């Protein structure tokens, strides 16, 4: 319901998903009648900090203090398998397989982020021709090549590609969020681009 509401609201209206926050604590913990009657405070003292943090994230985003571009790996990140080894037809994505359904749901989430203004980019160690193939021949792909503002599929170190992406988009490295299934790649990026 909140996702649908968020999709239908004008761009200048932002939703603080209190339902999701309260579910983390339970409604008995979230709401305290004493605080409501004393100060008309809808959140218990115990749950006030997460409520304020979530509100601060929304306000921060309004003032440009948030990530602008989500940079994602491809293999075992938006589809199951390695396209260079398994070929596009051998990748796991889509209905009928729990793993494939999870990758499809992740792609749907990424597309929602794009529709809300988050830029999407690819940074993958692959030959570009192999990396592009699933976008062309797999109808289960929710994301299309056109959804990405930058597409780096090569064998350069990922920190180098991330620098290039930031430069192309004219944004700082601190405006990038990097998503990769490989802990070694994440650590390499973390070490080289602190």
Predicted regions and their residues:
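Short, conserved active-site loop motifs that form the nucleotide-linked donor/cofactor pocket
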Residues: 13, 148-149, 176
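Short, structured coil segments at secondary-structure junctions
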Residues: 9-11, 146-147, 192-194
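Short, surface-exposed basic-aromatic patches at helix termini and helix-loop junctions that form
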Residues: 136-140, 168-170, 190-194
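Extracellular glycan-modifying ectodomains
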Residues: 1-71, 78-79, 84-85, 89
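The substrate-binding groove and active-site-proximal loops of carbohydrate-active enzymes
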Residues: 39-46, 91-100, 172
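Alpha-helical substrate-recognition element adjacent to the catalytic core
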Residues: 69-71, 75-160
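Conserved Lys-Pro-Asp/Glu-containing loop-to-beta segment of HAD-superfamily phosphomonoesterases
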Residues: 162-183, 189
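Hydrophobic or amphipathic alpha-helical targeting/insertion segments
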Residues: 1-5, 179, 183-185, 192-194
């Amino acid at each position: 319901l909140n996702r649908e509401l968020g999709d239908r609201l004008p761009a200048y209206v932002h939703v603080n998903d209190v339902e999701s926050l309260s579910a983390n604590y339970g409604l008995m913990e979230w709401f305290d009648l004493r605080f409501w009657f004393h100060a008309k405070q809808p959140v218990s003292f115990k749950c006030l900090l997460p409520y304020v943090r979530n509100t601060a994230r929304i306000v921060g985003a309004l003032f440009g203090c948030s990530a602008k571009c989500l940079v994602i790996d491809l293999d075992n990140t938006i589809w199951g398998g390695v396209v260079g080894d398994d070929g596009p037809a051998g990748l796991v994505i889509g209905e009928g397989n729990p793993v494939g359904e999870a990758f499809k749901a992740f792609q749907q989430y990424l597309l929602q982020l794009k529709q809300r203004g988050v830029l999407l980019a690819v940074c993958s160690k692959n030959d570009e021709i192999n990396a592009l193939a699933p976008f062309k021949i797999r109808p289960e792909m929710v994301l299309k090549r056109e959804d990405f503002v930058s597409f780096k599929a090569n064998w350069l170190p990922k920190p180098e590609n991330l620098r290039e992406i930031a430069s192309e988009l004219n944004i700082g490295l601190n405006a990038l969020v990097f998503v990769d299934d490989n802990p070694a790649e994440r650590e390499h990026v973390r070490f080289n681009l602190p």
